[in-house]
């Protein structure tokens, strides 16, 4: 959120006279970054992260017939996001995206370029799957960098905590950040409607280059 006063004053005018059929949602770590005039014109709702125990309880209530082991698996994939946990249990695209991200992590841990390419090509022709899978893989890279720097397991955000720990043993925090940036670039290419097959081939090569330079 841009907190420059002039920008917030412009935002205030939009809030006071919003375009027709428009809902405005503002997010921030604290409402205090907004001008008092904005705060007085909006509904402020506090949000807190959901613990794994809370996720388990919610999912067990929603899916009483599902085995606890499967619910625990969904919680590990969703990492405190109950919506993601539900999508995982119902085998929506998120389930396949998690599989893709974890597969990339395993392929990197194994140091095999062919496995990287094979994992990525599962999403060939599936733009939204590839994009979401790469976004989840970025979360794994984030965890890998954090673990390398001594981060705590409880603060892990990815769908592959143990995989990120394994990756952190061979990937420095700087290398994880560089690879994160590479993946960001390729997500941008996907958004720009670049050819998916060519994008996958190029990305696999870039990941392999990062592996041989570890």
Predicted regions and their residues:
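Conserved H-loop
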Residues: 26
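Conserved AAA+/SF3 P-loop NTPase catalytic/coupling segment centered on the Walker-B
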Residues: 1-12, 33-34
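Charged, glycine-rich active-site and insertion segments that engage polyanionic ligands
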Residues: 20-21, 29-136, 140-143, 147-211
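Conserved catalytic/switch belt of AAA+ P-loop NTPases
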Residues: 9-23
């Amino acid at each position: 959120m841009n907190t420059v006063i002039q920008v917030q004053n412009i935002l205030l005018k939009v809030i006071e006279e919003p375009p027709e059929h428009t809902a405005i949602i503002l997010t921030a770590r604290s409402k205090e970054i907004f001008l008092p005039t904005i705060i007085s014109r909006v509904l402020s709702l506090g949000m807190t992260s959901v613990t794994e125990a809370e996720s388990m309880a919610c999912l067990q209530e929603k899916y009483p017939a599902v085995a606890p082991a499967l619910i625990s698996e969904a919680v590990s994939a969703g990492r405190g996001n109950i919506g993601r946990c539900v999508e995982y249990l119902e085998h929506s695209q998120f389930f396949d995206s998690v599989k893709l991200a974890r597969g990339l992590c395993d392929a990197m841990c194994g140091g095999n370029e062919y496995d990287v390419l094979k994992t990525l090509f599962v999403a060939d022709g599936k733009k939204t799957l590839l994009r979401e899978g790469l976004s989840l893989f970025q979360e794994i890279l984030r965890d890998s960098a954090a673990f390398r720097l001594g981060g705590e397991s409880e603060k892990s955000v990815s769908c592959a905590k143990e995989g990120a720990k394994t990756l952190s043993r061979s990937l420095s925090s700087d290398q994880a950040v560089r690879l994160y940036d590479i993946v960001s670039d390729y997500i941008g290419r996907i958004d720009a409607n670049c050819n998916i097959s060519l994008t996958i081939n190029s990305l696999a090569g870039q990941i392999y280059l990062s592996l041989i330079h570890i």
